[in-house]
Amino acid sequence: MARHSFFCVDGHTCGNPVRLVAGGGPNLNGSTMMEKRAHFLAEYDWIRTGLMFEPRGHDMMSGSILYPPTRPDCDVAVLFIETSGCLPMCGHGTIGTVTMAIEQGLVTPKTPGKLNLDTPAGLVAIEYEQDGQYVERVRLTNVPAFLYAEGLEVECPDLGPIKVDVAYGGNFYAIVEPQENYTDMDDYSALQLIAWSPVLRQRLNEKYKFQHPELPDINRLSHILWTGKPEHPQAHARNAVFYGDKAIDRSPCGTGTSARMAQLAAKGKLKPGDEFIHESIIGSLFHGRVERAAEVAGRPAIVPSIAGWARMTGYNTIFIDDRDPFAHGFSVA
């Protein structure tokens, strides 16, 4: 029998949790972070489920594990873990991870105020603002984002037939905008969105193929982004992003905001240099910006950036003990 210990720094980004594993993570094989991600999923996924699910976590829990970079142009590598699996990229997770890693001295940037992250989705460039010991703001320049498909038809429980656009911003998102059978996220409860989203996701994945043209391992739709009119006076739009099995992102969602900007840019509603302020279901804001035009395997794309803040909430030494019948976690349907 064995007891495995994990030293974690807990915090949140604009309201959504981030658990940074600062000690206890496994050594992983692979020459890239995508290969290391595959090794983790094949051999160590019990760490993810044990730390993310109940009784040590909860339905909204997400986190990260730090590793030495696999490429010379990066300061540190990050593996993202959450209840839904190991995401190739996580925007709110990046902002929280960078904030806590800098404040706790877990990462020493080569250039103060700047950091390059090695993620499974690719290089993510970071700029951060620090006041004394505290990081007040983080801006990440994400991987290229693009509109993948428009007007995909799918049957949604209770609502009936709806159409969605699918965009990539580090993960694939189905974007639900106002239409005949859907008005605004505010017209439905969070419980309704949580009930409909996994069915919608399953039906879309069964009916359509979602394949990143350059990254073979990114081959399914993972998130649903429900849109709405903003309530905050600075915001351009509001969203409720569904992920995992029953979670609504409390932050505006970084990769979701990237996907949304890519969708709007593809339709001529955003251009390089434009800002896009995205509001979450709890009213927190991410400040997005279209940095420049790009291309992914011949497909028009943008390079988006996202700025937000995070706060540390405490330290946590977590045991995963083989004697515990719930060592690897559980989720109640």
Swiss-Prot record:
Subunit record text: Homodimer.
EC number(s) recorded for this UniProt protein: 5.1.1.8
Highest taxon, organism lineage: Bacteria
Record GO terms (molecular function): 4-hydroxyproline epimerase activity
Residues reported to bind substrate: 91-92, 249, 254-255
UniProt-annotated catalytic positions: 90, 253
SUPFAM superfamilies: Diaminopimelate epimerase-like
Gene3D superfamilies recorded: Diaminopimelate Epimerase, Chain A, domain 1
Pfam families assigned: Pro_racemase
Keyword Membrane part of the UniProt annotation: no
Family recorded in the similarity comment: Belongs to the proline racemase family.
Catalysed reactions, as listed in the record: trans-4-hydroxy-L-proline = cis-4-hydroxy-D-proline
Keyword annotations of the record: Isomerase
InterPro entries: Pro_racemase_fam (IPR008794)
Protein role: Allows intracellular utilization of 4-hydroxyproline, one of the major constituents of host collagen, by converting 4-hydroxy-L-proline to 4-hydroxy-D-proline, which can be further metabolized by intracellular 4-hydroxy-D-proline oxidases. Strong B-cell mitogen. Plays an important role in the regulation of intra- and extracellular amino acid pools, allowing the bacterium to profit from host precursors and enzymatic pathways.
Uppermost EC category: isomerase
Protein name: 4-hydroxyproline epimerase
